[in-house]
């Protein structure tokens, strides 16, 4: 098998293994389960990975990508309709909750916790990029929108972990209120009107 095909197949296997971990749980999933899910002979997964640890960490990174792409994909598609955007984020959080719980199980694991931290740090470093991009869309400063981005991320994370709307709704409603204010201010600016003296 060529290296390109091996790399492509490895990506496919990571996605399948992540689904398997999400379904069965981190500690209950065996290498045999992963091989079966990936349609490999027993032990065949080690042609693509050296150790189970490597598989787990690759799946954790894939989980981060799924959650990040799911959330920010909605934001940049729907930010012109903030009410709809927030509703869709809630639906996405429902869907991604099992994936987030797998990720949390990796993060709190004695075996993998320290080793997954670099992937989490890379994610955190991208928040400033998203903040600037959202600020540009809303025609405001990054400083104005940054607390709202972090509040929304916190709300989504809490909801995906605990599946409790009572934790999620107040935070999301607070973020939505301020985002709507910024969107309305942008609209007034574009119309040449600054009601109430706000700039």
Where are these regions (language model features)?
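Hydrophobic alpha-helical segments that form the core
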Residues: 142-165, 171-182
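Helical hydrophobic small-molecule/effector-binding pocket
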Residues: 82-108, 113-114, 188
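Short, basic, alpha-helical segments at the C-terminal edge of helix-turn-helix-like DNA-binding modules
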Residues: 61-67
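Helix-turn-helix
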Residues: 12, 16, 20-54, 58
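N-terminal intrinsically disordered/low-complexity leader segments
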Residues: 1-8, 191-199
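Hydrophobic alpha-helical connector segments
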Residues: 58, 71-96, 142-152, 192-194
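Solvent-exposed, amphipathic alpha-helical segments
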Residues: 12, 16-23, 70, 74, ...
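Amphipathic alpha-helical packing segments from all-alpha helical-bundle domains
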Residues: 68, 72-73, 95-98, 112-142, ...
């Amino acid at each position: 098998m060529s290296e390109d095909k091996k790399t492509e197949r490895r990506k496919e296997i990571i996605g399948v293994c992540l689904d398997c971990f999400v379904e069965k749980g981190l500690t209950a999933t065996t290498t045999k389960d992963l091989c079966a899910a990936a349609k490999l002979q027993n032990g065949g997964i080690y042609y693509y990975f050296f150790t189970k640890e490597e598989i787990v960490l690759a799946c954790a990174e894939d989980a981060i990508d799924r959650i990040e792409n799911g959330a920010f994909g909605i934001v940049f598609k729907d930010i012109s309709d903030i009410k709809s955007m927030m509703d869709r984020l809630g639906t996405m959080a429902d869907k991604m909750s099992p994936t987030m719980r797998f990720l949390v199980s990796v993060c709190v694991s004695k075996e993998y916790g320290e080793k997954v931290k670099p992937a989490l740090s890379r994610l955190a470093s991208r928040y400033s990029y998203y903040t600037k991009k959202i600020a540009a869309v809303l025609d405001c400063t990054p400083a104005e929108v940054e607390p709202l981005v972090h509040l929304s991320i916190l709300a989504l994370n809490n909801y995906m972990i605990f599946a409790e709307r009572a934790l999620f709704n107040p935070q999301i409603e607070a973020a939505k209120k301020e985002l709507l204010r910024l969107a309305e201010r942008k609209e007034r600016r574009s119309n040449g009107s600054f009601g109430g003296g706000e700039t």
